[in-house]
Amino acid sequence: FFADFTGSGTPADFTYLEPLRAPDLTWTLGLTYEWEAGPGLAYVRASAHHIGEHHTSQLNSPTTFNKEQTLVDLSMNYELNNTVFAFFAKNITEEDGFTVGYDVFAGAAWTYAMARKPRTWGISITQTF
């Protein structure tokens, strides 16, 4: 396709660029096991989300290229009436890819990316009204 990505005022041929954030392969596998526990419902969840290699910036900068990665999340939950208490761990394998990439002034100034969150864990309470 032809576009003026560089701000020169003249469209150029950018057909060689791969689409950003468009891996050839993605998949997700999730498992949930639940059981009645007292007056509520307890359940555990595990999921794995695979993202194939892909570019995160418009101009396919090699500094913002993501190699393939598999994100693994786990949680233990207890649901009582309309409230869910959860202990969770996200990205437990510490995958360190980028979520998005930017080419400032079409890469003439610099290119940068936003890093994926590292391993995170916590407790949450969710109330549904």
Model-derived regions: residue spans:
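Gram-negative outer-membrane beta-barrel transporters
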Residues: 1-58, 124-128
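Short, charged/polar low-complexity linear motifs in solvent-exposed/disordered segments
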Residues: 8-11, 61-62, 102-105
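Outer-membrane beta-barrel domain signature
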Residues: 16-20, 60-65, 110-114
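Residues that define the transmembrane beta-barrel architecture of outer-membrane proteins
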Residues: 23-27, 68-72, 117-121
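Generic structural signal for short, solvent-exposed loop/turn connectors between secondary structure elements
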Residues: 38-42, 61-62, 79-85
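C-terminal beta-signal and adjacent terminal beta-strands/loops
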Residues: 49-57, 78-129
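Residue-level recognition of alpha-helix initiation/capping sites
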Residues: 67-68, 78
